[in-house]
Amino acid sequence: EFHLRDHTADIAVESLALTLEEAFSGIAEGLSQAHSPNSLSGTKKFHLNISSESLESLLFDFLDMLIYERDVYNVLPTNHKVSITQKGDIWNLEGTYYGVPLDTIESREIKAVTYSDMEVKKTPNGWRLYVVFDV
């Protein structure tokens, strides 16, 4: 016998910023805080270069890459800096972050970024980004 039960296993992050780059960096910092609420600083610098056909897919690919690199390099990405440009129909993100070794911190696992309720919106005060992660 079994029963299906509703279960929420998500965490959402909102970033409000004057610039698109600050909003992307804010969402990435939110991802770091969702992993570990402690204030952390990494020592090893990592570089990212991501291209996509929309801002939503660029945001998804950026966060997905941070989760992937967390798993591959066993570091929690922190202190994110990004530059975003558009050339024709293609958006490009170049960025850096510092990695905190996972074996030195207590953290919960964020499994994946989702498109569920994702929002990338220009506002009168700058930018609003909203992302839901599976935990």
Descriptions of predicted regions:
Residues 1-135:
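N-terminal intrinsically disordered, cationic/polar leader segments
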